[in-house]
């Protein structure tokens, strides 16, 4: 089918309104190979669920090259829960889940409520606000900052760093985006190192 070859994920028209193409992909009824992107497109809920649950599919991190340029970025990703499968994934998930057990969440609840209240107060002061940009996006960032013990002065950097780093999961990443990802990785790692050493 030509559809799998007829769109570009970076095409401004596709980004503006991806829904007609996605609808056609779903109507096709099965995963399709996209030659340019070198990947399978699973557009239906059933296909996506099958892919995510398949034990024969997974992700093992492949370091960015050249390694001297990407050293910090690669270091941050090599032991990421999202980049590993099997026993290593299970071990990492067990470590992370300790931060989200019932007791931890109960202890954090008052602080989370305070963050929610602050964000809602800010939205009220704005009068007109963007629910995503002014509430839904900053909320998890501020909660994660609270979990990690990140200072308010560093907290404002978490989202831009994250956005720059995850850009590397997209297709056709520009040289500027690569530089931004490396810089964000270095700045984030430096912040964590400072926190651990203090």
Predicted segment positions?
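Active-site substrate-recognition loop segments, prototypically the cytochrome P450 B′-helix/B-C loop
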Residues: 1-132, 141-159, 163-174, 178-185, ...
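Generic, well-ordered alpha-helical scaffold segments in large soluble proteins
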Residues: 191-198
């Amino acid at each position: 089918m030509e559809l799998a070859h007829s769109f570009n994920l970076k095409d401004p028209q596709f980004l503006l309104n991806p829904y007609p193409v996605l609808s056609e992909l779903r109507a096709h009824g099965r995963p399709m190979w996209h030659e340019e992107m070198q990947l399978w497109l699973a557009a239906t809920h059933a296909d996506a669920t099958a892919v995510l649950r398949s034990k024969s599919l997974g992700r093992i991190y492949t370091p960015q090259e050249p390694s001297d340029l990407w050293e910090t970025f690669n270091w941050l990703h090599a032991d990421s829960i999202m980049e590993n499968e099997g026993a290593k994934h299970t071990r990492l998930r067990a470590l992370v889940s300790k931060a989200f057990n019932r007791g931890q969440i109960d202890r954090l609840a008052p602080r989370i409520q305070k963050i929610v209240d602050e964000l809602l107060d800010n939205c009220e002061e704005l009068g007109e606000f963007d629910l995503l940009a002014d509430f839904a996006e900053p909320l998890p960032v501020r909660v994660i900052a609270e979990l990690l013990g990140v200072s308010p002065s560093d907290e404002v950097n978490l989202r831009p760093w994250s956005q720059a780093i995850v850009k590397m999961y997209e297709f056709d990443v520009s040289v500027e985006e690569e530089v931004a990802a490396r810089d964000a990785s270095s700045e984030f790692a430096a912040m964590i190192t400072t926190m651990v050493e203090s």
